[in-house]
Swiss-Prot record:
It is found in: Cytoplasm. The keyword Cytoplasm applies. Its main location: cytoplasm. Pfam families: tRNA-synt_2, tRNA_anti-codon. The lineage of its organism: Bacteria, Pseudomonadati, Pseudomonadota, Gammaproteobacteria, Pasteurellales. Its EC number is 6.1.1.22. This is Asparagine--tRNA ligase. The keyword Transmembrane does not apply. It catalyses: tRNA(Asn) + L-asparagine + ATP = L-asparaginyl-tRNA(Asn) + AMP + diphosphate + H(+).
Length: 467
């Protein structure tokens, strides 16, 4: 029985020259020479580069099948690994047998025909776009980053916690949530006041898709000390931008007995760890992004790893922006939420390095962030990266029950709705901190792909839930 190998193993020299091997994949291109040879570029997704298979016209199905192969056909090719005289790859396959597993029905109308497609067009055929160079490379980088995140936390002694996707609480207090209901929309039950009676719904109360796993994560951090969540989150924001998705993935660590300084250190260590991993493990894909998408991809990651994070208080950051002499689209004053242009000025022009901005005004931050002694600011932080702006947002959590209750009431929230969250402060409360990393934002940063819809397999956005 001939050994079956992935193309990456053949190209990386794990199969000896002269060994017979079978590869399975899809045709990227076929070209024929007058000398009675066909050159098949075959990919299987295991790496960026295809392998070249040389097929002689003495193969039994050469005329009937090999010469009919087009982009997208699936093949099983058995042959001998030989040194390649061609530039760009060390080895190729001298084919002895070509079996066609699947034909492309009509090559003329095949949506992934061998030509340059716009990234916008690829979104319309999201079920086929993984076959392209760019989306295949994004998928491998996404996998590498996810594995590196899990590895980092495991090595640091964190436990992964699966927080629920269905919830009754709004972590952000923003109200932009997707409702989960089995009620008959044609015949909604009403209470005495005419409002929808959610007590008759599946969960017996109003329920939503989660906007964050943080609150649930805190409960486990207050028992296991160090945890993280990594899963999908949902926002019903009507935002049609290159930066927003209705469904996206979040990485949310939570640490007991931790301060804002511990939080910032964890964020720095994690980002540098995953960037080192992707530079090491996905060189082939990053070289493609560097050549075709963003020339600075590799140098940006290397600079990030080699930079010490700057730290600045929000109040001082506002002063830096006011003194910059720059005319910003959004005016700068104490109390504003920093916009992307402000964040990028700080990271790219002022500090020329990643920067942690901390201690934000309480009025622009969430109820669970720890109130500072000045009574005006909270122990919040944002990590700003050159080239994108905010990449991580986090805070030290409010561990004092009386202060937490007061903040909730100030923000129009009912403390009773958060009774279980408040219990953490009643029974052995502890200073703790955590942050959120939008996973797709991270992939955008690493690949240079500008639209967030192109770094998630099936993007969900306003009026778009195809596939």
């Amino acid at each position: 029985m001939t050994k079956v190998a992935s193309i990456v193993d053949v190209l990386q020299g794990k199969i000896a020259i002269g060994e017979t091997v079978t590869v399975r994949g899809w045709i990227r291109t076929r070209r024929d020479s007058k000398a009675g040879l066909s050159f098949l570029a075959i990919y299987d997704g295991s790496c960026f580069d295809p392998i070249q298979a040389i097929v002689n016209n003495d193969i039994e199905n050469y005329e009937t099948e090999v010469l009919r192969l087009t982009t997208g056909c699936s093949v099983i090719v058995t042959g001998t690994v030989v040194e390649s005289p061609a530039e760009g790859q060390a080895v190729e396959l001298q084919a002895e047998k070509v079996e066609v597993a699947g034909w492309v029905e009509d090559p003329e109308t095949y949506p992934m025909a061998a030509k340059r497609h716009s990234i916008e067009y690829l979104r319309e055929v999201a079920h086929l776009r993984p076959r392209t160079n760019i989306i295949g490379a994004v998928a491998r980088v996404r996998h590498c980053l996810a594995q590196a995140i899990h590895r980092f936390f495991h090595e640091q002694g964190f436990y992964w916690v699966a927080t629920p996707l269905i919830t009754a609480s709004d972590t952000e207090g923003a109200g932009e949530m997707f409702r989960v209901s089995t009620l008959d929309l044609e015949n909604l039950p009403r209470d005495d006041k005419g409002a929808v009676d959610f007590s008759q719904d599946f969960f017996g109360k109003e329920s939503f898709l989660t906007v964050s796993g943080q609150l649930n994560g805190e409960t486990y951090a207050c028992a296991l000390s160090k945890i993280y969540t990594f899963g999908p989150t949902f926002r019903a924001e009507n935002s049609n931008t290159t930066r927003h998705l209705a469904e996206f993935w979040m990485v949310e660590p939570e640490i007991a007995f931790a301060t804002l300084a511990d939080n910032a250190k964890l964020a720095e260590d994690m980002l540098k760890y995953v960037f080192r991993a992707v530079l090491e493990e996905r060189k082939d894909d990053l070289k493609f992004f560097e050549k075709h998408v963003d020339n600075d991809v590799i140098s940006r990651l290397e600079n990030f790893i080699n930079s010490d994070f700057a730290q600045i208080d929000y109040t001082d950051a506002i002063e830096v922006l006011l003194q910059s002499g720059k005319k910003f689209e959004f005016p700068v004053s104490w109390g504003i939420d920093l916009s992307s242009e402000h964040e990028r000025y700080l990271a790219e022009e002022h500090f020329k390095s990643p920067v942690v901005v901390k201690n934000y005004p309480k009025d622009i931050k969430a109820f669970y962030m720890r109130l500072n002694d000045d009574g005006k600011t909270v122990a919040a932080m944002d990590v700003l990266a050159p080239g994108i702006g905010e990449i991580i947002g986090g805070s030290q959590r409010e561990e004092r029950l009386d202060v937490l209750d007061k903040r909730m009431i100030e923000m129009g929230l009912n403390p009773e709705d958060y009774w279980w969250y408040r219990d953490l402060r009643r029974y052995g409360t502890v200073p703790h901190a955590g942050f959120g990393l939008g996973f797709e934002r991270l992939i955008v940063y690493v690949t240079g792909v500008q639209n967030i819809r192109d770094v998630i397999p099936f993007p969900r956005s306003p009026r778009n839930a195809n596939f």
